[in-house]
Amino acid sequence: MFELIPYTRFRDTPSVRFFDVTIADSNARDLVIHRGPAVSPPDAEESGAWQFYLHPHQDDNLLAASGGRTFYLVNLAWAQPFHIVRLESGGDILNIPRGTFHRSLSDPDGSVVLNQAMRNPNACLDREFRVYNSLKIPRLYQAT
């Protein structure tokens, strides 16, 4: 199941706050910048069907550094397979476990998200970022 992970404020100075946003066991960092109301991955060109990423060898730990994003999560092994999760700048870190279909929509002004991923040794970026068309996976399409 996905999880919202709080982080700790460890220091304040005039007009400045410091936070420890460390994710234990993270071994990869991705900075993902959306300009405007981007959808990732984009809808299928031919049909307009929703498309998703699914990482077989990676857990995502997403922190909105600027703006906000709405995540659509589907995991067919969960009792409730479909969830919509809002990620806001200054909010919790969203953990998306491996094997979860996910896509996101940024706010109108865009967003910047830091992913402190946990990749296992079998991870290959080409395979981890494969796009899945929901129309071609009946159970995924029905869940959304």
Give the role of each language-model region:
Residues 1-89, 106-144:
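Active-site region of the double-stranded beta-helix
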Residues 91-104:
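Histidine-centered metal-chelating micro-motifs
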